[in-house]
């Protein structure tokens, strides 16, 4: 058995149709990088697990004991992975070009100090999907504090109608 360079882990919950398109896109735009596809089903309980397993016998299909969330599925998939690198995908991802996976793999090999990377994502109409950053905890606390102060001042203003000015 040759060395697997990349383990592609996909966590599924009742997304069989888009998952099939995802796997078919790997067959259409097959990477040169050696890879395995691992699908972790988060206990969909919709009766489609076995038929999907027969339809895509080339993938590792793992049934989780419950729906413990995306991260649990990723952890279970990575436990079963034998690739040098891990690629986590959502089931609604489809490849649109051949070099996409190979380029990411080459980047990871050439930059061993990089621990995580991503790629450009596009909507199905071809438009670029915007990257979304999470708010820092301090910014979140600041927003919540402002909302609380505003709500509190409105409550106080109602008690004292002559002081209608909130700000």
Which residues does each predicted region cover?
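N-proximal low-complexity "stem/linker" segments adjacent to membrane-targeting elements
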Residues: 1-27
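Short beta-strand/loop segment that forms part of the nucleotide-sugar
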Residues: 34-43, 62-64
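Short aromatic/hydrophobic "clamp" motif used to bind/position activated sugar donors
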Residues: 86
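A conserved acidic beta->alpha catalytic loop
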Residues: 25, 41-49, 66
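Short, flexible, basic/aromatic active-site loop/helix in glycosyltransferases
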Residues: 137-167
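The conserved acidic donor/metal-binding loop of glycosyltransferases
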Residues: 90-94
